[in-house]
Amino acid sequence: MDIKRTILWVIFSMSLVLLYDNWQRANGHASMFFPSATQQQAASAPAASAAQGDVPKANATAGAAAPAAPGGAPQAAAQPTGEKIIVTTDEVRAEIDTAGGILSRLELLNEHEKDGKPVVLFERDTTRTYMARSGLIGGDLPNHTTVFTATPGPRTLDGADKLEVTLTADKNGVKFVKTYVFHKGSYVVDARFAVTNDGTAPVSPTLYMELARDGSKVEQSQFYSTFTGPAIYTDADKYHKITFDDIAKGKASTPAATTSGWVAMVQHYFASAWIPQAGKEHSFYVQQIDPNLYRVGIQQPLGQIAPGATVTTDARLFAGPQEERMLEKITPGLELVKDYGWLTILAKPLFWLLEKLHGFLNNWGWSIIALTVLIKLVFFPLSAASYKSMGKMKDLQPRMTSIRERHKGDPQKMNAEMMALYKTEKVNPLGGCLPIVIQIPVFIALYWVLLSSVEMRGAPWLGWIHDLSVPDPFYILPIVMAVSMFVQTRLNPTPPDPVQAKVMMIMPLVFSFMFFFFPAGLVLYWVVNNILSIAQQWQINRMLGKGKTAAVAKS
């Protein structure tokens, strides 16, 4: 039996490793065993190019990714140069490059890095590329390689509720006007596009709006991963993540043309999205532009424009933090960029409850503690049933050991006698595991709530914990967690299998090492959960002890 248990433990451990590796790859991270295409490109390619001569081709068929080769207009010998317009609101500081009318830099003024500087979402330099672009396809028309002229006007809100930046370009008889409207207290920029045919023949342009980004991860951790890459949403196909690796391998696909949905670039805590005008038919595309540069976009045909006529259309550009309630109000499905994985059905109500607790306590750290306590109380009956079953199994250990010794040469007879013993004593050998298994998805869902919630960024708890989204600077919480895990292990019945016993002794050390690098909010959750489990186990053992004493007294 011992060798069988050892084999089962090996299989179980390997399954966990493979599941973890699959989770890593699902989030666009590298496999632990095989280098991905994006890994190999990142190793061999220079920094992501910020070249602008990569105008997309019109989509030939809906539902297919754009070809990997750059298409469209011929590339100029030198990159165009334009004016950098700096727009400042109460939420963002944006840089608009008139060379292409591109949003080439965006700082989130109320979200800060560890050094206190604003988070930079859009950026274009020699080391990083992430920008929002738009233009026209259909002949040599104004696009994101064309130099625009900016209309003079205010560049800061200065008490106003909104400000507009208007850019104009004329090319081959077509005038293209982009107007960006920035609003007070908002991460949404309204985009108005007007196309005028100043020529003598009809034109049929297609408007494109895209997000271009290098394939580098914002964060790197060996112990937890979050998705970085494009995403597409439609009413029919719902939320669809696309990994950079799939784009590089030509495996990416996009939904069919529709009148709903949006495209986004997603990373930990933040996202950007182009949201086209509702009711206008459009198609989607994803593409690898350079070895480490990718894009996701929308193409919207504007129909035939007669000479002298003008066609207008609107869109919205979101760029900001993944605040769930804010995203829900912008457009259907946008809150899904906050990725809870396959446990969304559990994670969303848990976050709702966490928000409610924060409304009372006004501190995310205490809210995490309160939520963990509530969950423990809800599951207390299941835990009591589990410990009761394990207690019965412990009482049967001497008789089970005797059966194993008597029939160690006859596994079939040994198993039959074991089952007879379970039936006689009314014990379910899985009774101690099933209640715990039921609880596991809830605790995993809470783990992902805490990992993905931007509200934890910069949120203090008490004393030395000034930011629940970064590791404990003094490693106090991981050490407390190690001690609590060790105590919890000692309180549990010693497994009869020596291999299991060794694993149970080593686990506190392994987990403690991992949690040294985890965000403090996650470690706080595990510490509180462990301490409550110890208290719960003591109380249940006390209750079971009283029950045994009463039973002995009656007999």
From Swiss-Prot:
It comes from Cupriavidus pinatubonensis (strain JMP 134 / LMG 1197). Its main location: membrane. This is Membrane protein insertase YidC. It comes from the Bacteria. GO terms for cellular component: plasma membrane. NCBIfam families: PRK01318.1-3, yidC_nterm, yidC_oxa1_cterm. GO terms for biological process: protein insertion into membrane; protein transport. It is a multi-pass membrane protein. The lineage of its organism: Bacteria, Pseudomonadati, Pseudomonadota, Betaproteobacteria, Burkholderiales.
